[in-house]
Curated annotation (Swiss-Prot):
GO biological process terms, semicolon-separated: DNA recombination; double-strand break repair
Record organism: Staphylococcus haemolyticus (strain JCSC1435)
Classification via HAMAP family: RecO (MF_00201)
Family assignment from sequence similarity: Belongs to the RecO family.
Gene from which this protein is expressed: recO
One GO CC term, this protein: bacterial nucleoid
Keywords, sorted A to Z: DNA damage, DNA recombination, DNA repair
Entry function: Involved in DNA repair and RecF pathway recombination.
Record's protein name: DNA repair protein RecO
Entry keyword annotation includes Lipid metabolism: no
Pfam assignment, any one: RecO_C
Amino acid sequence: MLEKQKGIIIKSVDYGESDKIITILNEHGAKIPLMVRRAKKSKTGLQAHTQLFVYGLFIYNKWKGMGTLSSVDVINQYYDLRLDIFNSSYATLCTEAIERSMDNDDISPFHYKLLHFVLEKISNGDSAQLMSIIVLLKCMNRFGFTAFFNHSAISNSYDQSKLVAYSFVYDGTILESELYKDPHAFRISNKTLYLLDVLQKLPIDKMNQFNISQEILDEMSELILLIYKEYAGMYFKGQKLINQLKRIEY
C-alpha cells in the first residue's frame, strides 16, 4: 500500500553498506520509521533528501512492519541552517531531545509544531542556542521531571527579584538569604531565572522577537543541561559537538 506523510526527518541511521533507516515526525505528531534502500548511492537521488531536518512529503510502501521509502517531495531542506556548524549542532540537539522525549507509539502534534517552529526560527536568523533552550524546557515533563524558576523551594516566596541560585538539594530556586542552607547551589543571575520562567510558560505561538544576551544564553544552557543530567542522567550527542566547537573557538 502506498502511503504519503508530510513530516521532518528527526533521525537517520546507516544500515549496511548502502541503506539507511530514517525516522520522520509527521504532521500529526507520530514517529514513522522508514527503510531507505540504496540511500547512500548518489544515483538514486535519495542521498540529499534523507538527511536530518529535511521537511517534505514522504511517499513510501507500507505492508507489515517498517515502510520502504519510494520518493521525497522536498518542501524545505533548511540548507542555510546546515551551512553554519553551530546552528546545525543546536538544531541536532533540538531534534535529538524531541525524538528521545517520545515513545515509538506516541502521537504528539505539539512536538511536530515545536520542531517546525525552531527550525524555521533558526533558519530565519534567530539564536539556535535559544531554540535549543526552548525545546529542552518544553520537553522536560516528557522525561519524567520538571523544574520551576519563579519561587523559593525553601520558603515558597514568590519574590523573583531575590532568587539567585538553583538548588539540587531542595529541587528548585532559592533566595540569597537561603544560600547558607545549600552552599553548593548553582549560582545564576536573577534575570536568567526570570527569562527561563517566561520561556517555560509562554506558548510558542506567542514567541516573536528575541533579544537575549550571549551571557544569559550561556547561563540558561548550563543550568538546563545540568538539570537534565541530575534528574534524568541524560546527555545529548549534539551538546558534545557544541562543547568541542567552543573549545576550538577559544
